[in-house]
Every structure is written in C-alpha cells, then in structure tokens.
Curated annotation (Swiss-Prot):
Keywords: Disulfide bond, Glycoprotein, Hydrolase, Lipid degradation, Lipid metabolism, Lysosome, Signal. This is Phospholipase B-like 1. GO terms for molecular function: phospholipase activity. The maturation cleavages that produces chains A and B are required to open the putative substrate binding pocket. Both chains A and B remain associated in the mature protein. It comes from Homo sapiens. Residues 1-38 form the signal peptide. Glycans are attached at N71, N308, N366, N411, N526. It is found in: Lysosome.
Length: 553
C-alpha cells in the first residue's frame, strides 16, 4: 500500500519510472508537441478478442477501445479529473466488453487513489472487526444473486443493463490489478472494490447487521450518515433553472475525482451513455449524488436516516444495492417517472435517500415548466415512494436537507418520535436548513449567488443556527467547540440549464471558509487516516468540463 509523500506525510504515489518514461517518450520524439501538464496520465485500452484480455498503452489513441486521461490535481485543486471514452475504436465490441474496458481503464488510471480511498474509509465504516464477516457474507450472497439473474434473464432490459454495470466493476478490478502489478504494490481484491462502491449502502447495511441492545433511538452525528444539502432554483420568469449540491460526510472521504464518461453503448433501451458527475476513486457512482446525464436528466440526492430499527431488519441480500439501481436507472430512464419505476425494482433498503430527478427536456425557458419536470423519489426498506412535484418548483425552489418529504416515509422512518423527543429541528418544515433555504433562496439569481447559499455557514450570528456549526447549509463539525470531529460539508457542485447542456459544472472541494471561517487543516485531526489528501483545504471553485473530442490525434 502506497504511503509516499515528503516528510512522512500522506501523499500521492509518485509515477513509476516506466510510466513516466512512456509519458515522456512522445515529448522526446515529437519536439513540436507542447509539454503535458505534470500529473496528467494518458492511457488507451485495447480488447484482445482471441486472448480475451486487455492490453494497455500509456498514450491516447482514438482507435483504441477505451481511451482517456486522469489529471491527478488533488493537491492543487482538491479534485482529480477523469475522462474516458469507450466503444468508439476501430473494432466493434459488445456492450458488455465496452463497459469492461471502460472500467479497466478507470482502474488502471486511478488505482493508487483507489487504494488510498479504501485505506481512509475502511476504519470509518468497520469499527468492530466482528461486523466484517457479516458484511462480507451479505455482499457475497448479494453478488452471487445478482450475477445469477443477469445470466438467467438475458432478454430482460433491466437485467441486461445490470450486466453492463457489473461488467464495468469487473473491468475496474482487473485494470487496478494491472496497475498494481506494474508498480509492485498489492492489488485490491474484488471484494475491496465492491466494498468501496457500496459505501453508501453500508451506512444502512452495517446497522441492519448489528444487534441492537434495546429499542433506544440512536441519533447519529449530523454528517456520519452521508447527509447533504441540495437546492433546485427557478428564476421568477423561468429565465433559468439552477441546481446545486453540497455533500456532508466524514472528511476521511475527501479524496475526490470528478468524472466524465462517454460510452458508445448501443441498446434500444439505453437512454444515457454519456454523463458527468462528482465522484471518488474506485466508485462507479457519484454517492453524493450529482449527475448530468445525456438523457436530459439531472440527478441530485440527500440522505434520509431510518430511525426505525425494525425496518432495517428487513434488509436481505436478494436485492440490488442502491448504487447499482441508480446506475441502471440513469442508463435506462428518459423521464423522471421512468427513473423512479426502474430504481424501485429489487429495493435493498440500503442507502435510503431522497432523489430529485430534474428533466431539463420539460423546461421551456421564459415560458413553462411542463409536467414531469421534477420527480421526488424516496426509499426506505421494503418501500419506495415517488411523486411529481413540478408544482412546488414553479413556485420558485425545491430544497433538500435530510428530512423525508413523503408523509408515509417520514412516519415509517421514525421522524415523528424524534420530533416528540428532540423538537422541531427534525420536522420537514422547521428543520434549521428548511428555514434558512426558505429565507435566502430568493437571493439566488445566478451561479455566483447559488455558490454562496450552498457554501453558507454563519453559525455564530444566524439565529436559525443557534451557535451550532451544523445547523446550516454547509456544516463544519470540526468547529463544534465542545466536541470537534472531522466531518461535515466538504464540497459543492453548481450548474444551470445552459452549463448542463455542455456537461459542465462548477465544483469546489473542502470544508467551507465562507464569512471568514478558518481553513480546515488535517494536523488538528491526524489520527483520522487521510492518505493521498492535501494537508490544507483552501481551494476555489473550478470549472468541470469534458475536453475529449472525436478528433483527438
């Protein structure tokens, strides 16, 4: 496992001499070519049909089966940037092989960071070694069940698309293994890669597998269940529609990659094979969630806690995990309703969230928001509820802040009891962020003001925060004076209808410093593993935009 970095501090692994040589070779041969920026790795994967293996070269070749780059800029901007195009090469491949080589290339390009991310997150999730056996057993059964259904129902479009996603994760594993072998490091196991992809699901799976001593209500820290803030804002004359998302979780998860994928999957039931989204090393999903899809759909998500432990006992392995269902729905759906229908199948009851599916095809600027513009989808174990909520959006905004919207979901999850015991902070209408969004959303008129509200934290002066650095849009639990811990809001992504048409967004990594809040430094929390991360987070918003064109040489 790589732990490089000057002064013994966790840092990014240095590129191996061979890889560096291959990266520099084109510069030595073609002197007219401008030098590549430091830390940008190019690679192309070639499927070898006879051997059923993948060959990889450290060049960008548009005739290859998957090609792309990884810009390892985590230390300078807080983000790595990955862009991959697959299935556009000189040979015709099946959709499964296209997905496999796309996964392979991602694994090959990002393996060192995948290792770091696993190292950082494992101790956050597995606090007792005894739970790991139960998790592994559950996940092995779930994987076996999934693959059995993919084989059995080849003509079913849902299972066919599930097969594409599983081919991609298999490729990710093989590609990461290839890179590890080249560098002489220990390869990650397939289970470790599945564990990474299931981080969101594990937030509910682990409590469901843990024995509860009594019926006591466990109230989690504000960030440890992956809580987030999201906002969709429509301007008064429908001149523009803006959307944004700020992730909350442990700061141990701050190793970030923004991804642009373009996979040439030809299937009558595929609606989106090109997408841009915020993500993490080794994740084939966003987790946040923040997706811009070629179907014209935007997907945002915030997490709902399930305080009803009886519900969590309903979780079984013969289901599809949330990350898998999100990926299948993203690929297949061309409308909010269709997304909700697909996502509802084989509900695992893990990573129980509120999803906002915004259909930009239904938005007629300066004219109307047609029916179907916004669907809200919420999941708990054994039940998914969704509804068309464009009417609310027409009034100006849709906020999301970790309290369920649908009454049944709210009641079954145990929120009424929480309100009874702990007060209105847990209610849908009077949660602190509900009040702040209601008060301030009218000030959002463009991407700059959207950035401002989504990084907002004025906990010392805002009456709705009552002195608590997490009773606000962008939480800083590390500033909680009685009991600081390294968790909270650590990113923001912002876009509008115009940017989305170019798969573009503005993104910032790290805890908010708005209003003069102190910059986050790891030296205050050195016991928390943060391998591969910058020591200090003080970055600006950067523009995320895919740059690979068909005409690359």
């Amino acid at each position: 496992m790589t732990r490089g970095g000057p002064g013994g501090r966790p840092g990014l692994p240095q590129p191996p001499p061979l890889l560096l040589l291959l990266l520099l070779l084109p510069l030595l041969l073609v002197t007219a070519e401008p030098p590549k920026p430091a830390g940008v790795y190019y690679a192309t994967a070639y499927w070898m049909p006879a051997e059923k293996t993948v060959q990889v070269k450290n060049v960008m070749d548009k005739n290859g089966d998957a090609y792309g780059f990884y810009n390892n800029s985590v230390k300078t901007t807080g983000w790595g940037i990955l862009e991959i195009r697959a299935g556009y090469g000189s040979q015709t491949l099946s959709n499964e092989i296209i997905m496999f080589v796309a996964g392979f290339l991602e694994g090959y390009l990002t393996a060192p960071h995948m290792n770091d991310h696993y190292t950082n997150l494992y101790p956050q999730l597995i606090t007792k070694p005894s739970i790991m056996d139960k998790v592994q057993d559950f996940m092995e059964k779930q994987d076996k069940w999934t693959r059995k259904n993919i084989k059995e129902y080849k003509t079913d479009s849902f299972w066919r698309h599930t097969g594409y996603v599983m081919a991609q994760i298999d490729g990710l594993y093989v590609g990461a293994k290839k890179r590890a072998i080249l560098e002489g490091t220990k390869p990650m196991t397939l289970f470790q890669i599945q564990f990474l992809n299931s981080v969101g699901d594990l937030l509910d799976l682990i409590p469901s597998l843990s024995p509860t001593k009594n019926g006591s209500l466990k109230v989690f820290k504000r960030w440890d269940m992956g809580h987030c803030s999201a906002l969709i804002k429509v301007l008064p004359g429908f001149e523009n529609i803006l959307f944004a998302h700020s992730s909350w979780y442990t700061y141990a998860a701050m190793l970030r990659i923004y991804k642009h994928w373009d996979f040439n999957v030809i299937d009558k039931d595929t609606s989106s094979s090109r997408l841009s989204f915020s993500s993490y090393p080794g994740f084939l999903e966003s987790l946040d969630d923040f997706y811009i899809l070629s179907s014209g759909l935007i997907l945002l998500q915030t997490t709902n806690s399930v305080f009803n432990k009886t519900l969590l006992k309903q979780v079984i392995p013969e289901t599809l995990l949330s990350w898998q269902r999100v990926r299948v729905a993203n690929m297949m759906a061309d409308s909010g309703k269709r997304w909700a229908d697909i996502f509802s199948k084989y509900n695992s009851g893990t990573y129980n969230n509120q999803y906002m599916v915004l259909d930009l095809k239904k938005v007629k600027l300066n004219h109307s928001l047609d029916k179907g513009t916004l669907y809200i989808v919420e999941q708990i174990p054994t039940y998914v509820e969704y509804s068309e909520q464009t009417d609310v959006l027409r009034k100006g905004y849709w906020p999301s802040y970790n309290v369920p919207f649908h009454e049944k979901i709210y009641n079954w999850s145990g929120y009424p009891l929480l309100v009874q015991k702990l007060g209105l902070d847990y209610s849908y209408d009077l949660a602190p962020r509900a009040k702040i969004f209601r008060r301030d959303q009218g000030k959002v008129t463009d991407t700059a003001s959207m950035k401002y509200i989504m990084r907002y934290n004025n906990y010392k002066k805002d009456p709705y925060s009552r002195g608590d650095p997490c009773n606000t849009i962008c939480c800083r639990e590390d500033l909680n004076s009685p009991n600081p811990s390294p968790g909270g809001c650590y990113d923001t992504k912002v876009a509008d209808i115009y940017l989305a048409s170019q798969y573009t967004s503005y993104a910032i990594s790290g805890p908010t410093v708005q209003g003069g809040l102190p910059v986050f430094r790891w030296d205050r929390f050195n016991k928390t593993l943060h391998q591969g991360m910058p020591e200090v987070y003080n970055f600006d918003f950067i523009t995320m935009k895919p740059i690979l064109k068909l005409d690359i040489k």
